């Protein structure tokens, strides 16, 4: 059965991109070329929160993800949130939100969003799971928070 792992992280650095890279490193997905997809969970997949992703293959490979990414330039706070609602034997859904706000705000937004997304699809309600990550930056710093749903293992960029 294919596995989707939920990993999260945060980072503070002198530039916006360096903070994002640090957040990806904290989640252990920093050595992959991320391919972002929309929010449908395949019917045969399992979803597992793991905190930090395990080794998913060689550096430089592609990794398919749904990503919530919040960033701020200090002083400030950024939060990212991901909700998921898998359904037994049927497709499920992810919803993501991120902003310069509180973790409670992003949790409310992803919960409201995923409920609406399930309604749009006429899918039976499943109580969603939610994970948030928050980070604070001081003046002169940049900060990033990510919550990543990583689909399976990584794949080579080039055909062999």
Swiss-Prot record:
Source taxon at top rank: Archaea
Cofactor, free-text remark: Binds 1 pyruvoyl group covalently per subunit.
Chain positions of site Cleavage (non-hydrolytic): 38-39
EC number in record: 4.1.1.19
One matching Pfam family: PvlArgDC
InterPro entries per UniProt: Pyr-dep_his/arg-deCO2ase, Pyr-dep_his/arg-deCO2ase_sand, Pyruvoyl-dep_arg_deCO2ase
Claim: Ribosomal protein is one of the keywords in the record: no
Reaction equation(s) it catalyzes: L-arginine + H(+) = agmatine + CO2
Pyruvic acid (Ser) modification, residue list: 39
Required cofactor names: pyruvate
Alphabetical UniProt keywords: Decarboxylase, Lyase, Pyruvate
Entry annotated with the keyword Lyase: yes
GO terms for biological process, alphabetical: arginine catabolic process
Gene Ontology MF term list: arginine decarboxylase activity
Family under the similarity heading: Belongs to the PdaD family.
Listed PANTHER family: PYRUVOYL-DEPENDENT ARGININE DECARBOXYLASE
Protein name in UniProt: Pyruvoyl-dependent arginine decarboxylase
Organism: Halobacterium salinarum (strain ATCC 700922 / JCM 11081 / NRC-1) (Halobacterium halobium)
